[in-house]
Amino acid sequence: MYGKFQQHLQEELKAIEEAGLYKKERNIASAQSAEITLQDGSKALNFCANNYLGLADSPRLAAAAKKAIDARGYGMSSVRFICGTQDIHKELEKAIADYFHTDDAILYAACFDANGGVFEPLLTAEDAIISDSLNHASIIDGVRLCKAQRFRYANADMADLEAKLQEAQACRFRIIVTDGVFSMDGNVAPMDKICDLAEKYDALVMVDESHSAGVVGPTGHGVAEQFGCYGRIDIFTGTLGKAFGGAVGGFTTGRQEIIDMLRQRSRPYLFSNSIPPMIAGAGIEMFKMLKESNELHDRLQANVEYFRDRMMAAGFDIKPTQSAICAVMLYDAPLSQKFAAKMAEEGIFVTGFYYPVVPKGQARIRVQLSAAHRKEHLDKAIAAFIKVGKELGVI
């Protein structure tokens, strides 16, 4: 049987490669940071990590992780409800709830699991999910696992959202679901307007803060802080794998009864091992760091403004951004790959994104800024973009 299936896969893979859509991995042989060493020994500046606050190689977090291993061991060998809950898991959940001004929080192995496990326990075929068209794949998959009726509105389009809410008025419960920051374009969801519509049409609100927590808002606390929406958002999901240290682990935080129900019925929570003690210990320390100072957030914002302004002045087509994501639009998939390859030759580590990660004809280089970037890093990257952009006729 595998012979026929193997041939089918080989043909599919060949077609992907011929279309210029084949994704290849580049191996890093150093800690994740602004400056990295690749497996071939070459050095590069990294502008494609989710390391927004530059904490991925934080000595303080590494020390906290080591301390947790020494005190609580390497792993849990259990799910939470059997014997996989330690005191530090509960302490981290409390820190997350405090950060987002919510009642309680629940930990997952990843935010993909948090989004995949949030809808099915809470909603039935009598209910409606109204989801932004550019929401993350994990939200899309989570919605698919649920029997609720599905409505999709155009990205951040409040008129279309209102129309979909009107369509869903006959449903028992309605929930509006959005990313806080949309990962490919870098735009921020207008949470105040979303909450206004939710109140007008009696709907719940859920936001995925994966790319916004630690980044947007006056002190980096995400879209609820930026738009003054504390108390108006029912469910937050997020990750420890981006601004919050860059490791693994996801979470859902929100109203008490919602979190209680997820503990009882969310399948990724019930049937997956607990996050290891070292992740919990480092996560607790990370939230302590963010309470102490806004320095990392402020440095990140200064880097974003500096890079964006100079790239636009150079003539690049840049998506409007209010986050740490800067999308340099190229539109052509093979061009995005070629551009990324030439940037690597200049010592700049970026990735071309193209279909199916973004819609066809919307290929781009997604630049992600970090608090770890210094001015000389930014200047070198901008100079490389200008050089390669001129070579390839982009500017």
Predicted regions and their residues:
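N-terminal "arm"/small-domain region of PLP-dependent enzymes with the aminotransferase-like
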Residues: 9-74, 203
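Active-site phosphate-binding strand-loop segment of PLP-dependent enzymes
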Residues: 51, 151, 155-207
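PLP-dependent enzyme catalytic core of the Aspartate aminotransferase-like
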Residues: 59, 63-67, 71, 94, ...
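Short loop-beta-helix segment that forms the pyridoxal 5′-phosphate
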Residues: 79-85, 94-117
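Conserved PLP-anchoring active-site segment centered on the Schiff-base-forming lysine
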Residues: 118-137
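Active-site PLP attachment segment
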Residues: 219, 225-261
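PLP-dependent aminotransferase class I/II
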Residues: 244-311, 316-319
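Conserved PLP-binding catalytic core of the aspartate aminotransferase-like
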Residues: 298-307, 312-347, 357, 361-362, ...
